[in-house]
Amino acid sequence: MLFIVRVLGAISNNMPSIITQDDLEKAFRLLAGRLDLAQTETVRLVVCGGSALIATGLRQRTTKDVDIVALMNSSAHLVSPDPLPDFLLAAAKQVARDLGLFDNWLNNAPSSGEGGLYQMGLPQGIGERLTAREYGSRLMVYFIGRLDQIHFKLYAAVDQRDGTHLTDLRALKPTDIELEAAARWAMTHDVSDGFKMVLKETLRELGHESVAENI
């Protein structure tokens, strides 16, 4: 208990809602402390998006939230994060209040509902490319790897037309082989002709004309 109190006291309550790499570590440590105080079961989060880019050192930037694409069970199998456990959401709300984060700073938006990433199918082998971090006895966080970032970022860049995803994708410097694998995976999530057309345009914009022709 004394350890938890020291951790809580050591973390500033003036943390901005824009999350840096240091902020991310503080948030996870505090979340772990909240779970310990509540004596919850162990939770294992599989995280994608900007926070995973930051945590694994693939990009130096900020983010606004932590995107949970899956949970991992005690048998090391990935399972749906929809819905997230109530005890986790309660602890996350306390962290948001303590650190001044957005209310939904920890969310399952990428895999929420029937059309979510988990529900539609994750890239093959994603579980073998995770980077694990342990925060106390009740919180494990697994960050997705570079190849899976390429898959998700290409899909998001086409689906959402968001320049941030395209910027992240360029920073990952994907090869033709990696982009073709990502493109073919993305087309399993949206089989429409319109999506394929925009996907080809995006690949050409990235300078990968041959990939656009191959898919």
Describe each model-derived feature in a short phrase.
Residues 2-215:
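Compositionally biased terminal segments of proteins
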